[in-house]
């Protein structure tokens, strides 16, 4: 499943390349068009594709081969490759990791952070035992809602859910802008630190 990880997000064209495998089936979507147009695709080994030559699968035809979406995919992938954005994500992974480590050392509310390429996730905690601010399926604790508001005030929009948030900057970002983004996250985390139970 390369829907979130495909097309450079992890510093390789596809995340499965990090494991040195060649999957039988690959699903992809968002990165195909850089989310400018709706498009999804399934890639598969020839033997699997051959199976469907005489056994047509009639699902997923709503936007089948839509010319606008296909043109957006072609242009997006060309820019991604021509402008070195996959390499940029790989290069900036070290900067993102350094900044995530800084957040963890500067903010007691940061339990852990992980990153591959420019795909990151940060786990927050309300005490040293690692208890989350909100559980799975929770509609959002007041602390996490306040954190999201602070991020927006800082000019950042990201996925904040339960007791986690994502760090997924654009693949064209430069080092200075990436570091500034982390500085803004750090300022927003002050709200979460205020609720930390020491």
Functional labels for PLM-detected ranges:
Residues 2-198:
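Conserved N-terminal phosphate-binding loop of PLP-dependent enzymes in the Aspartate aminotransferase
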